[in-house]
Amino acid sequence: MLSLLAVVSLAAATLAAPAASDAPGWRFDLKPNLSGIVALEAIVVNSSLVVIFDRATGDQPLKINGESTWGALWDLDTSTVRPLSVLTDSFCASGALLSNGTMVSMGGTPGGTGGDVAAPPGNQAIRIFEPCASPSGDGCTLFEDPATVHLLEERWYPSSVRIFDGSLMIIGGSHVLTPFYNVDPANSFEFFPSKEQTPRPSAFLERSLPANLFPRAFALPDGTVFIVANNQSIIYDIEKNTETILPDIPNGVRVTNPIDGSAILLPLSPPDFIPEVLVCGGSTADTSLPSTSLSSQHPATSQCSRIKLTPEGIKAGWQVEHMLEARMMPELVHVPNGQILITNGAGTGFAALSAVADPVGNSNADHPVLTPSLYTPDAPLGKRISNAGMPTTTIPRMYHSTVTLTQQGNFFIGGNNPNMNFTPPGTPGIKFPSELRIETLDPPFMFRSRPALLTMPEKLKFGQKVTVPITIPSDLKASKVQVALMDLGFSSHAFHSSARLVFMESSISADRKSLTFTAPPNGRVFPPGPAVVFLTIDDVTSPGERVMMGSGNPPPTLE
């Protein structure tokens, strides 16, 4: 493993977040080593590794053979980083896991970049990271062949989501570099592996211009896909190639880049797996104005909007509630007990950089929000959001930040870089430098004895009933038992692509030594592919166990 020399040192502790309290509660834990690249994209690929990507500026501290790299493997067990060689520029790409466990990163920056490397354009790139069995990442590499494996259309700032056959639907983006709005849009959908020879045009993406980069999309349990962009939303039927227009987000709130709110598919529960979507943050800014007429001090919104995707729910429309504070660029992440973590973001301004009338250094945003909150979906309206017992960090996590649940049950948090290049702390005129510090946000159960799943089948069939051995701490009454099947998702630009939590019917034996649960009925409820199972007893969650949902075969390809 390569050293980051002085850059990756315990000196980072001098810039640490506040020390954790001795009292029980959530805690931020600043790691002793730096990431070497800005973690602006992150995805968990096994029990101990997070793949992170940066942009190819050629000035990152992390090196391979003396040259900068913009990919890395972060080891959750040792808090160390291993460089990962990347060919094309992965800046502002998307990604997900296929049905066979392969991680795919797609899209990126148009045009090559310089520095001490010459990276080819990334906006048609497909980057493939095969399943990695090594806990440290030793021998695990990224595959690229731009001449033969590439997108049908150029895409910078696209989104992606794993769908019912285990392939990826790739949505939107820009053909060209753009400082703020989407001025040369890729108003289309395509798939990986490809399902046809040409992209599918999207009237929805055309309507939702100009603030529709990184659309938020979720695979619904009937196989359709919910998409929200700008202040508009639809349900897209992949098999019929039709769209159903849904109500606009209330009060003119816009939620996609460069006016970033976040969105999440709320946990799905048996027997009906009724889908609901929550959208939080963003802004009411007027997109008819040029970015130079906007301000880094423009207030973000505290609004959250929630819709039930049934005929009755769609007719009723979005239900409005509010976070404890306004947030631009928040991120919403599933907690295994069914709550939603709300973290990161800024109180004012916008995404992107150096585009508004009064950037803060290079940042279009200001006033970082430093205290997370929890959203409880089944609590009464007006009482769903709380930050009681939540810690406060000193590290801004705004533009180009990431967060993801890990298999250990805590949250990896990294990144922040509203600058064109790697910009170290102390750079004159820069309030928000490139951030290499990594934290975890640790729930209270991390500091006590926990339930454990002692074994788990390597693969689960849809609808399969399984009994596995467990242990339960003696002080837990087991009055509430939850078994969650989760896709931990791909974090980038205030959105968690493919993130999913499906609760499974379950029971515990009288002697508390075994757990019986039933897997989801089909690949529409949980798209086939890698998953993590968590057991939560009385809000104390076990470490997760990885399984392959379905056969583990690759998704279908175009014949």
Curated annotation (Swiss-Prot):
Optimum pH is 6.0. It is found in: Secreted. SUPFAM superfamilies: E set domains, Galactose oxidase, central domain. GO terms for biological process: hydrogen peroxide biosynthetic process. It catalyses: glyoxal + O2 + H2O = glyoxylate + H2O2 + H(+); methylglyoxal + O2 + H2O = pyruvate + H2O2 + H(+). GO terms for molecular function: aldehyde oxidase activity. Gene3D superfamilies: Galactose oxidase/kelch, beta-propeller, Immunoglobulins. Coiled coil: none annotated. InterPro entries: Gal_Oxase/kelch_b-propeller (IPR011043), Gal_Oxidase_central_sf (IPR037293), Glyoxal_oxidase_N (IPR009880), GO-like_E_set (IPR015202), Ig-like_fold (IPR013783), Ig_E-set (IPR014756). Residues 1-22 form the signal peptide. It holds the Pfam family GO-like_E_set. It is an enzyme of class 1 (oxidoreductase). Its EC number is 1.2.3.15. Glycans are attached at residues 33, 46, 100, 231. This is Aldehyde oxidase GLOX. It comes from Phanerodontia chrysosporium (White-rot fungus).
